[in-house]
């Protein structure tokens, strides 16, 4: 049985729990809840857990290093589990996608996302699968402040649906492959 390292990007601590930048953590928490995998073990400068889900051995990781150092945590976990970049799936927020949309991508640049920038620096490559959770862009104001604010009330009302869509996309990536998952979820 193959294995996957599934990483949700975010910032640690209750202060950031419901911020837009923590969409990756939120999706990973939803996956953990649905799969019964506990993500509570302290390892790899993060919180981790493992189990079987969707006919795969999966290792779940929430780096606790703050976003701009997440690459260290991910690199450490990949080395420990002897996995390659093709076994890595990273879930993160994306300003360039409207709130409520979920898009899949293989490879590509960091687009100004500090977590992805850290991954590229530590891994020496961006050749891994991504689930991009749309958070939209601020109409006015600073992007940094925007990603560190909580979702608005009207967004919170539909957040669970977004998290479930992200988990569905992840499951299709694992079961049926990235091309099929991209053709379905990127068309929505």
Curated annotation (Swiss-Prot):
Reactions this protein catalyses: an N-acyl-L-alpha-aminoacyl-tRNA + H2O = an N-acyl-L-amino acid + a tRNA + H(+)
GO biological process, one term: protein quality control for misfolded or incompletely synthesized proteins
Catalytic center residues: 21 (proton acceptor)
Any one GO cellular component localisation term in the record: cytoplasm
EC number per UniProt: 3.1.1.29
Keyword field contains Hydrolase: yes
Site (Discriminates between blocked and unblocked aminoacyl-tRNA): 11
UniProt KW RNA-binding keyword: yes
Keywords: Cytoplasm, Hydrolase, RNA-binding, tRNA-binding
Enzyme class: hydrolase
UniProt site (Stabilizes the basic form of H active site to accept a proton): 93
Subunit structure: Monomer.
Function noted in UniProt: Hydrolyzes ribosome-free peptidyl-tRNAs (with 1 or more amino acids incorporated), which drop off the ribosome during protein synthesis, or as a result of ribosome stalling.
Name the record gives this protein: Peptidyl-tRNA hydrolase
Taxonomic lineage of the native organism: Bacteria, Pseudomonadati, Thermodesulfobacteriota, Desulfuromonadia, Geobacterales
């Amino acid at each position: 049985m193959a294995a996957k390292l599934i990483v949700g990007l975010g910032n640690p601590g209750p202060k950031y729990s419901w911020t837009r930048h923590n969409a990756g953590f939120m999706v990973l928490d939803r996956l953990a809840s649905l799969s019964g995998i506990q993500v509570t073990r302290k390892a790899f400068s993060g919180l981790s857990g493992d189990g079987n889900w969707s006919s795969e051995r999966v290792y779940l990781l929430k780096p606790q290093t703050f976003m701009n150092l997440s690459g260290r945590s991910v690199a450490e976990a990949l080395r420990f589990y002897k996995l390659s970049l093709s076994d890595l799936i990273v879930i993160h927020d994306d300003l360039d996608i409207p709130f409520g949309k979920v898009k899949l991508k293989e490879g590509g640049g960091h687009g100004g996302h500090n977590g992805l920038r850290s991954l590229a620096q530590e891994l020496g490559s961006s050749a891994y699968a991504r689930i991009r959770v749309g958070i939209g862009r601020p109409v006015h104001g600073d992007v940094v402040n925007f990603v560190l604010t909580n979702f608005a009330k009207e967004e919170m009302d539909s957040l669970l649906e977004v998290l479930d869509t992200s988990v569905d996309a992840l499951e299709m990536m694992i079961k049926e492959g990235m091309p099929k998952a991209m053709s379905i979820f990127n068309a929505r």
